[in-house]
């Protein structure tokens, strides 16, 4: 039954009559509020639970985010310093905040935006990215706006993946990619990145993680529909542009992850299907924050924001990684972004440590994560969450830290991590 936007759920239920022209369900929908006939029907269908979840969401093991939150709530060390999740510990630039406030006063910004996004934002993105692509982007046909980069990825997969199509992703991957690909019926093929062989004993550039291209070539086959590259890359030729979708996030760019403003750039013959899928998933995206993001893109260069952002993030990375140098813990030194992987193989966990069963059954990095939260009060993310079980061994000695926090938070985290000294065996 289709419910139009003017039809409330309660009205729709009231219109659904039994043969006796009486509502089958009372106003409340939980089982104990069903009327006697509904309860009888429920009893006869007990073998086929009418409230059973779909397979795409059922039977999933506990995700890393809820495990970290559980550990943080139970830790005797409070408050926890959250260095795990990649949210910013500070506000967007003032020109972006001011633009968001001003947008709320505009009538048109408080109503539905065009399904493909507000024209001002699409123009601002086209202007910002045209130099990088080496061509003048058409904002009407080569840019579309989505509700965050994650929904943009889902729209791209929904727009092109049919059941049985294969998508290649590299490990480590963002865990949302899995459900985004599987929902339209795609099959995932995995190719891992390999750390340097001496990564447990030497701090090395993150660029030394490498792809086995022979392994990649063997994975490509006639069913391969897409390859996902979760890394900054340059478009090297016009031919590559014609078959590439680039996904971006205004929230990540301007320290505003809660805004959920994403975008895709690509040729018209690809973008139109992504936009079509987006329209059917959520119709349109948040209008006032699109306007704010447009102003932010327009003013970023003039305000020197991009250069300042790169400089400040590099300083934060260097500041935080001082603790790893001090503890002689090797790490993958990133050349961009705000995540760092530290190799914790020298941290020896007590053999009798009381890990809960759902942590004890997971790879070593989950135990390291739980241990850090409970013993020193610092939260990190176990990167095997971003690997298949077959390749989890590659990352089980690492932990991921996010440095996009205020400097005082970084200093507190460093001081607490010094508590690991007594557990380190070189």
Where are these regions (language model features)?
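Short beta-strand to alpha-helix junction loop
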Residues: 116-117
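PLP-dependent class I/II
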Residues: 2-18, 24-61, 72-104, 130-426
């Amino acid at each position: 039954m289709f419910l139009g936007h003017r039809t409330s759920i309660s009205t729709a239920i009231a219109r659904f009559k039994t043969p006796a022209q009486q509502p089958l369900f009372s106003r409340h929908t939980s089982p104990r509020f069903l009327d006697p006939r509904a309860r009888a029907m429920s009893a006869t269908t007990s073998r086929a639970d009418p409230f059973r979840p779909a397979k795409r969401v059922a039977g999933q093991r506990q995700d890393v985010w809820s495990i970290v939150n559980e550990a943080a709530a139970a830790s005797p060390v409070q408050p926890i310093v959250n260095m795990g999740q990649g949210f910013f510990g500070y506000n967007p630039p003032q020109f972006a905040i001011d633009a968001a406030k001003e947008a709320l006063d505009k009538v048109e910004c408080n109503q539905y935006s065009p399904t493909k996004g507000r024209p001002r934002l699409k123009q601002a993105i086209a202007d910002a990215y045209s130099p990088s692509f080496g061509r003048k982007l058409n904002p009407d046909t080569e840019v579309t706006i989505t509700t965050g980069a994650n929904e943009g990825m889902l729209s791209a997969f929904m727009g092109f993946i049919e059941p049985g199509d294969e998508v290649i992703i590299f490990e480590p991957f963002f865990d949302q990619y899995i459900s985004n690909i599987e929902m339209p019926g795609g099959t995932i093929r995995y190719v891992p990145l390999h750390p340097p062989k001496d990564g447990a004993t030497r701090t090395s550039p993150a660029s030394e993680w490498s792809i086995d291209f022979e392994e990649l070539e063997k994975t490509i086959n006639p069913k391969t529909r897409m390859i996902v590259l979760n890394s900054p890359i340059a478009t090297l030729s016009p031919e590559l542009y014609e078959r590439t979708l680039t996904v971006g996030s205004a929230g990540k760019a301007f320290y505003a992850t809660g805004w959920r403003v994403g975008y895709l750039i690509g040729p018209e013959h690809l973008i139109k299907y992504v936009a079509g899928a987006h329209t059917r998933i959520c119709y349109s995206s948040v209008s006032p924050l699109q306007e704010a993001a447009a102003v932010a893109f327009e003013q970023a260069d003039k305000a020197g924001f991009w250069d300042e952002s790169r400089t400040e993030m590099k300083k934060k990375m260097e500041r935080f990684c001082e603790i790893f140098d001090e503890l002689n813990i090797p790490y993958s030194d990133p050349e961009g972004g705000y995540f760092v992987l530290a190799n914790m193989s020298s941290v020896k966990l007590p053999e009798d440590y009381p890990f809960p069963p759902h942590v004890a059954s997971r790879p070593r990095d989950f135990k390291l994560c739980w241990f850090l939260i409970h013993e020193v009060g610092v939260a990190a993310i176990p990167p095997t969450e971003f690997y298949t079980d077959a390749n989890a061994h590659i990352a089980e000695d690492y932990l991921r830290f996010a440095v996009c926090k205020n400097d005082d938070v970084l200093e507190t985290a460093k001081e607490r991590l010094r508590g690991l000294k007594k557990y380190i065996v070189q």
